[in-house]
Each structure stands twice: as structure tokens, then as C-alpha cells.
């Protein structure tokens, strides 16, 4: 939604002088350039971290604000001693997937950065549908290329859907992106399970009656259907390196540890 700013007095006259000098074609262009210069001077990553810790914004929200990638902002947060709250806080955040699921951008990142991609491929071959908004197609293309360069299977398994992304609004205590809100709306209207590794996005989705689980449900479903994969230790390590929160009891069950 366009933002209107009222400028008058000396500031307005100075802006018009810049136009008169031919430095800008219009006052609007001069204002846009001033705003760009402002953002270039700000430490957007530090401000994004404040949004995350103080305002409880979703990780996607701070990624969008900072202009960083998920990996970039997570690395910055870890360097500041603030691990992201992503993954599953409790076993109830993990379940066996019995039908099609909708992925948010963070979950796409988690899947492709871990061995969940291999599990998702086999589940997809067995009939489980994975949907994602079409706007993440460039992100998926990059992640697939990275996997291919590492010699890993990068066969496509995600089907894209068009979601209606609305304007930026204030959502109260939890700040989520317009895309995240649109995905919650789409999952609710289509009866899909939303896979999100952002605890705050899941909290937002639950408010609207949307079934939502962590991407760790992919591993849970795989183990239920096919048994424990031989590389389960590597799979867990790849998830922890992101770093995803995995409930201890779930990890021990997957590893076959009994107490």
C-alpha cells in the first residue's frame, strides 16, 4: 500500500530547489532517493534482530525487512547469541502426514538444506503432495542447484499454487509477512496442512483453525511408512545445523534409544 507523506515549509522548498537545479525530475523522486539513502545508513540486521526479539516477528518478517536470506539472517542471529525459535518445541508439533501439505518459504529452506529433501522425494513418489506458493520458485531453483552441485538428488517434487497476497497490515502481537498470512488463508480454504518451522507462524495459523506442523513431520511420516533410514544420524545433524529444535524424546525414538 503506497505511503503518503506530508512535507511543507523549509523542507518542501529545499526539495523543490533540487528539482529546479535539475538534480531530480520531481519532488517524489527526491523523496524516494532520500528514503533509500536513509535505509542504506541504517543497520537493518540489528533492527531486524530487535523486531524478532522484542516484537516477536516471524523469521520471514525479519528476512524481508533486512533484505537477507534465511541463512544470512540466521548466521547473524547466532553471531549475536540469539538462536531462532524454529523447529518443534513439543512432540505435538510433529505428526504423520496423511494428506497434501502446503510449505512456507522457511520450510522450503529447511527441507532443501537437510536430508528431509530425500525423504520428501520418496514420500512424493508414494503419493504425498507438496504445495508451495509460486513466488518461491526462484528460491527453490537456487536450492536445487546447490543440491545438484553437491551431488545430491535434486529431482523436483513441489507443485506451485497461486495465493492471493494482500497488503501489509498490522496483525497484532505477532508480526507475520503478507505471504505468510496468505498461506494461512489458503491452507484454511483448501483444507491443507501448513508445514511451517516457524513457531510464531504456527501460532498465528492455529488462531484461525489451520492444522499446522513442523517439517520434522516429513521424517516422522517417512519412518512410519518405510522405517528408519540408514543415515538417520546424518539427517538429524543436518537439521540441527540449521539449527532446528528437535524434542529430545522424538530424537531418541528416531534413533531407537530406549531408557
Task: State each model region's role.
Residues 1-7, 19, 81-89:
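Short Lys/Arg-rich basic patches
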Residues 4, 194-196:
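Conserved SAM-binding loop
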Residues 9-29:
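Surface-exposed, Lys/Arg-rich phosphate-binding patches that contact polyanionic backbones
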Residues 27-48:
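Short, basic amphipathic alpha-helical segments that act as recognition/interaction helices
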Residues 41-66:
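Short, positively charged interaction helices/loops
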Residues 49, 63-96, 100:
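Charged, low-complexity intrinsically disordered terminal regions and linker tails
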Residues 96-192, 199-204, 208, 220, ...:
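Active-site-proximal, substrate-binding regions of enzyme catalytic domains
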Residues 215-226:
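Long, charge-dense
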Amino acid at each position: 500500500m503506497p505511503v503518503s507523506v506530508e512535507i511543507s515549509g523549509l523542507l518542501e522548498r529545499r526539495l523543490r530547489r533540487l528539482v529546479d537545479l535539475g538534480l531530480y525530475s520531481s519532488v517524489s523522486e527526491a523523496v524516494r532517493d532520500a528514503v533509500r539513502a536513509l535505509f542504506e545508513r541504517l543497520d537493518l540486521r540489528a533492527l531486524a534482530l530487535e523486531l524478532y526479539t522484542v516484537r516477536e516477528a516471524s523469521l520471514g518478517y525479519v528476512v524481508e525487512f533486512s533484505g537477507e536470506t534465511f541463512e544470512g539472517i540466521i548466521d547473524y542471529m547466532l553471531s549475536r547469541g540469539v538462536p531462532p525459535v524454529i523447529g518443534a518445541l513439543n512432540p505435538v508439533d510433529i505428526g504423520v502426514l496423511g494428506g497434501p501439505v502446503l510449505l512456507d518459504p522457511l520450510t522450503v529452506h529447511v527441507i532443501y538444506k537437510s536430508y528431509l529433501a530425500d525423504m520428501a522425494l520418496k514420500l512424493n513418489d508414494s503419493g504425498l503432495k507438496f504445495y508451495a506458493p509460486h513466488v518461491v520458485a526462484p528460491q527453490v531453483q537456487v536450492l536445487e542447484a546447490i543440491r545438484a552441485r553437491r551431488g545430491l538428488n535434486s529431482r523436483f517434487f513441489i507443485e506451485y499454487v497461486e495465493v492471493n497476497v494482500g497488503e501489509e497490515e498490522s496483525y497484532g502481537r505477532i508480526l507475520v509477512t503478507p505471504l505468510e498470512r496468505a498461506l494461512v488463508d489458503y491452507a484454511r480454504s483448501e483444507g491443507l496442512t501448513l508445514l511451517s518451522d516457524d513457531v510464531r507462524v504456527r501460532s498465528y495459523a492455529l488462531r484461525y483453525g489451520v492444522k499446522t506442523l513442523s517439517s520434522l513431520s516429513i521424517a516422522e511420516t517417512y519412518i512410519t511408512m518405510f522405517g528408519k533410514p540408514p543415515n538417520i544420524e546424518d539427517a538429524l545433524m543436518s537439521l540441527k545445523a540449521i539449527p532446528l529444535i528437535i524434542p529430545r524424546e522424538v530424537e531418541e525414538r528416531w534413533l531407537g534409544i530406549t531408557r
